[in-house]
Amino acid sequence: MNNYQITAWCSGFIRNQVQEGDLCIDATMGNGNDTLLLSSLCGSTGKVLAFDIQEQALNATRERLDTANAPDNYTLLLESHANMAQYAEPDSVNCIVFNFGYLPGGNHALATRGETSVQALSQALVLLKKGGMISLCIDSGGDSGFEERDQILAWLKQLDSHKYLVIKSEYYNRPNHPPIPVLVIKLS
């Protein structure tokens, strides 16, 4: 990793986590970068569910997957990540990826919100199998970013440490509230 982007940092952990045949979720589809990564890692025997509420994100992701000749192992859902539990069984998902904030190049008014993000994270814990991982990139920019960041971090802090390992990192010397990477591992 030489570009020092939080998403690249998180993708290293995702690459170590996801195996051929896994079920994975991209909870915030965006422009499809994580969907493509998950699709390539879980291969033709795996499955990726990708969520976004914007048609623009779904179209951009479909184009990215088609251009990359991604395996036909994904379902793109024009749906809130707060409804992900309707699409997978409990204890069945190995990796769930969240990039909070707004769609790059999109309408900044259409950003993730603390309330629905915490709902989605609650569902993610139920869907995650033992040993599974959630990768979060928390961007505090935008109109609701600080509020969402604070809600998510407060929610993560109260998780039972016997059931979940929560690892939070941060840029220590960067100004302007850079994104915060967090990993959650389901222990039991």
Sequence positions of predicted segments:
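S-adenosyl-L-methionine
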Residues: M1-D22, L36, S40, L58-D91
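Helix-to-beta-strand junctions that scaffold the AdoMet/dcAdoMet cofactor pocket
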Residues: Q19, C42-G43, L128-K130
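Conserved beta-strand signature within the Rossmann-like core of class I S-adenosyl-L-methionine
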Residues: T28, L127, G131-I138
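Conserved SAM-binding loop of SAM-dependent methyltransferases across substrates and taxa
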Residues: N31-T45
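Conserved SAM-binding motif I beta-strand of class I
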Residues: K47-D52
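Mobile active-site "lid"/loop adjacent to the S-adenosyl-L-methionine
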Residues: F98-A120
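Class I S-adenosyl-L-methionine
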Residues: F146-S188
